[in-house]
Structures are given as C-alpha cells and as structure tokens.
Amino acid sequence: MITWHDLYTVLTAVIPLYVAMILAYGSVRWWKIFSPDQCSGINRFVAIFAVPLLSFHFISSNNPYAMNLRFIAADTLQKLIMLTLLIIWANFTRSGSLEWSITIFSLSTLPNTLVMGIPLLIAMYGEYSGSLMVQIVVLQCIIWYTLLLFLFEYRGAKILIMEQFPETGASIVSFKVESDVVSLDGHDFLETDAQIGDDGKLHVTVRKSNASRRSFYGGGGTNMTPRPSNLTGAEIYSLNTTPRGSNFNHSDFYSMMGFPGGRLSNFGPADMYSVQSSRGPTPRPSNFEESCAMASSPRFGYYPGGAPGSYPAPNPEFSTGNKTGSKAPKENHHHVGKSNSNDAKELHMFVWGSNGSPVSDRAGLQVDNGANEQVGKSDQGGAKEIRMLISDHTQNGENKAGPMNGDYGGEEESERVKEVPNGLHKLRCNSTAELNPKEAIETGETVPVKHMPPASVMTRLILIMVWRKLIRNPNTYSSLIGLIWALVAFRWDVAMPKIIQQSISILSDAGLGMAMFSLGLFMALQPKLIACGNSTATFAMAVRFFTGPAVMAVAAMAIGLRGDLLRVAIVQAALPQGIVPFVFAKEYNVHPAILSTGVIFGMLIALPITLVYYILLGL
C-alpha cells in the first residue's frame, strides 16, 4: 500500500526538476532574461556536454554483468510488438503510412528515461530500479535510437529515389555518396548524377547541389530568421548569410526590374511582380513581360511547380516523367482561370547568371533549368525561370487550399499532385510528404508501381547515412565509452583516476538540472504549447500514456515479470516523451508538431499520470 510518505518521497525527487523547467520558461516568457540566441547557446552546451556526460556517468557506474535480462527482454519485446504491428499497418492497409508508423513508434516506446525516469523510479521503488533505468538508457542510445535513425534515413532515401528516378529505380545497382552529404533529411539541396554502366545498370552519385535552398512557410532550419514579406499572404524566411556558390544578389535583380536605385520600400505586388490573382474568373494580364522586354528577356509561361518537400526534378535522361511537361504552357490559362478555391498568387521571374541562386522547391518555388530549350534559344546565357505560387494565409496560419491536401492550387493542384511520384501528399499538421498513393486509392485510379533498388543497395545507402549521423552525435560516444569502461571496471575492479572522475562529475552533476532548464527554454520559445491541434494532441497523449504502458504490461507478463519488476516496467513506459525522437522528427520534418506537443504537454501532465499508475499498481 502506498503511504503519504512514499508520495512525498516521489514529489521530493521530481518537483525540483519542474522548478528548473519553470524557471527557464519564465526567464524567456515573463522576465525576458534570455534572448533566442542565448537560449541557443545554452541548448548547445546541454546537447554537447551536459547530457552526454550525464549519460556517461550513469552508464559507467552501472554494473553491466548484473543486468536483469528478463527486464531487458520485456522492454525489447514491447518495442518489437509495436514495430511489427506498425509495419503490418503501413504495408497492408490503405490508411497506413511510413511517417505515422515512425511517429507512433516514437510516441509509444521511447520515453524520457534518462532525465525523468531515473530520479522518479528511484524514489518510487528504490535504487535497484535506477539500475534498471540505466539499462534501458543503454539500449535506447545504442539500439533503438539507431533503429529510429535508420527508419528516417530509409524514408529520405525512398523519397530521393522516387523523385529522381521514378521509372528506373529498380535499375540502380550502386550509390556513391560524397563525403559532404551527411543525411538525407531534406535540409540539404541534393542532386544525383547517374551513369549507365556496361551492364546497362545505373550507378548513382549523390552530392550537394550548388544551389542553396530557401524555405517558405516556416519549413526551414533553425538558422532562419522570420521577416514579414510585402508579398500578399506570404511569410518568407530568409537565411542571414549568402548561400555558398551563389552569384545572385538583390541589387542586380532590382536593377533588372527597372529600379536603378535598388529596392524600393513601398512597392506592391501588382507594381513589381505583376501578381495575377486567381480570385476572379479572368486574371489580369501581366505586365511583367513588358518589364523584361527592356532587358531582352525571352518569352516564358507558367508551368506547375514541383511537389512541396521534394528533391530537384527527375533527371530527364533516366525518367519518362517529363512527357507531361510539354503540356504545361497550354494548360496555363486554364489553370489560372479555374483555380478559384483559394487566394493563390502567381509569381514568375527570370534570374540571369544565377547558377547557384537560392531557390526553394519545397514550397513550390522551382527553377527551370531547361527553360531555354522549351521556349526557344536565347542569347541570354544561363537564364533560369523561377515559378511559384504564393497563397494567402488564414488567421490560424493554414493556407486556403483544398480541403484535404493543403497544397497551393485548389482543385487543379490536387489533380497535379496525382502526377507526383507515388502520390506524395502534405499532411495538415505539418509539411511532411507522405509516401502513400492515397488519392489514387480514394479515386480508384491505377498508378504505376514505382520500383525501388534491390534491398542490398538500399541497405548500404542507409547504413552509410546512419553511420555519418552517429559519428557526429556526442551521445553515441558517451554511451559506447561508458559501456566499455563499465565492462572493464567491473570485470577487473579498475577505478577511474580521481582527476578524470571529478572532471566528469562536476559537469554531469549539472546535467540533470540543465537538461530540464533547456527543456523549459524550448517550451518558452514555442508559439503554442499544443502545436498540432487538440484532437491530434489527444491522440498523441493517448498513445504515449496508455498504449505504451498497455503493450509493456502484455510484454512483461509474457516474459514472466511479477511484483516490483512488473510495476517498474509499466511506470517506465508511462514516462513523458523522449527528447531525442523529437530532435529526429524536426530534422527530418516528420510530424515535428506532434512530437513537440508530446515533449512539452506530456511533461506537464506526466507527473500526475505516473502518480496515478504508481498508486493503482500499489493497491
């Protein structure tokens, strides 16, 4: 039976963690002590030094020869059960998807064991439960986070191959990834170079593109500073520094537009860009061609852009997907006149001599490298046509797009999305592209099967990318070195030198509080605590605090755990969401809003929920 003294002991261990988190939150939101840049520096210190040294401290001081194999087996079985069910759901049901499988797996099986689990379980069930939590931390860092990274890289590789080689993916027999490419997470603008070998198979080289990506609608990296745009309904996020290899500059652009004095402060979209609105039945004719005529520009028309969140257009030498591209100029006016379900604005411009110009294809901004071939030869060498749609935002930040896909072009856009390889879609709660041909299934259309390279080729590519990510992660080194030292120290009874031990201890002692402080800073910097909507947040919390513990209870009883071991296993599964899965979700843009809500809101409600589990299991 749980006594009031037991509850007080638990609160004594956990409340100080929340005090650190609340202080950090108030320092940013209420007292304005820290700026976003200062918060970034604190988070950097926590990620590189505090948390890795905290992991090393716990792992190196835990006896690996006294590990409870049945407890580890129960934890492993829980994750394998969830993984198996999600794989079946993703591959054999219409509603399944790889993105949601990864998200649900993260929510249900990867709690915040290091920061919350160790102090909470020690207060509840004694020092031995703390040793069990350290064993879970070791498995998480070495096995399960690596598996999660493997799934994210598999998704990135699948998108890359489907978009670059939609028809010839099965013919790829090798990938060579240049050393500066560290991930397929979509943040780097990648390009592929395919060569046909003597055997008729494709040998692909993946490298970074010279063009830097510009991201729209908040889909960019952490270095992007939001600035309001005077383009109607658009919020443009621009990098502070000029991208590498870019010879595009704004002075040349505005001079080309006919403004010798540079950028004017009071220009409007109609005066500068000749934005055509699709709101009316007949769009106003553009005067952009008249302005460009003074610069001897070639003729051009609007062609539907690529899918948001996509890689560069497929290589025409190895894909037959460009057959529909020749119809684009004829469909231009039909597209504009009919697409009246949203407030999309069209923007077209030419940029001369901008081989490395910062262009985003994630939000529909696309550079037509072959524009001169399509509209006739021009004496303006190196001209690139930039085409994009800018849609107005509603008050809550969502575009006025079609009811299901949230893209930029309404009904016509939904028809164009069907032509994207394997029916890529955008989710409503974030800008993640799904890999399932949902529209084709709903409409009963038949879509061509997109063949993937052999499993051995895909596995080698993914392992290369996972390895490059792991060797750049400080937690990888701290976990492995801590485990190796524990194996040596407890096998031959070797003590760590006092100087090294005290040097590690002085930083690791601050790790727990700094980790919670960093989490509070993260909460304060978010515009909303619930970023993905109430219904989605409710679903995420149900998966985190009910599905995970339920599956763990089944797995633990199947292994034969009883008594306190069973209680520790269930309470451990009901801890708040782990931070590392959220970091991965943000890097790969797979439901980051859901994982953010799981971390923030889950931390707020975790204490009463775990106390309820503690009381019920103690009856």
From Swiss-Prot:
The keyword ATP-binding does not apply. Induction: Down-regulated by endoplasmic reticulum stress treatment. The chain crosses the membrane at residues 8-28, 39-59, 72-92, 102-122, 132-152, 480-500, 504-524, 539-559, 565-585, 599-619. Residues 1-7, 60-71, 123-131, 501-503, 560-564 are extracellular. Disulfide bonds: none annotated. The keyword Oxidoreductase does not apply. Residues 306-340, 393-413 are annotated as: Disordered. The lineage of its organism: Eukaryota, Viridiplantae, Streptophyta, Embryophyta, Tracheophyta. This is Auxin efflux carrier component 7. It is found in: Cell membrane. Acts as a component of the auxin efflux carrier. Mediates the initial auxin gradient which contributes to the establishment of the apical-basal axis in early embryogenesis. Together with PIN3 and PIN4, involved in the connective auxin transport (CAT) that ensures communication across the shoot system, and modulates strigolactone-mediated shoot branching control. The abcb19 pin3 pin4 pin7 quadruple mutant exhibits an additive phenotype on strigolactone-mediated bud outgrowth responses and shoot branching control. It comes from Arabidopsis thaliana (Mouse-ear cress).
